[in-house]
Amino acid sequence: KAVRYYYRKFLRICLRMGYPLDDSDNSAIIEQNAKRMFRPESFSSLSSVRKIYIKARYSEHKVTESDVNQIKQDCDVLRKECDQMEKRT
């Protein structure tokens, strides 16, 4: 549940960055389009968020505490970038 919480948080960050989420968008499309809004330095965080979300949602593998900590850290990185962008406007 924690991973899905952080994924929803990530989606809210994307909305703040101006990404018009569509109900038909899957995680691959969201990641691809988010790369147009975030700096290249954040691409690894975007990929990590998707990878951990897929593991939690579709995989037989258990989500570890490390996975939760990583997606939280990635969301923090993306949120900080979003905050910086908002301050510039």
PLM feature spans:
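Membrane-proximal, non-transmembrane interaction modules
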Residues: 1-89
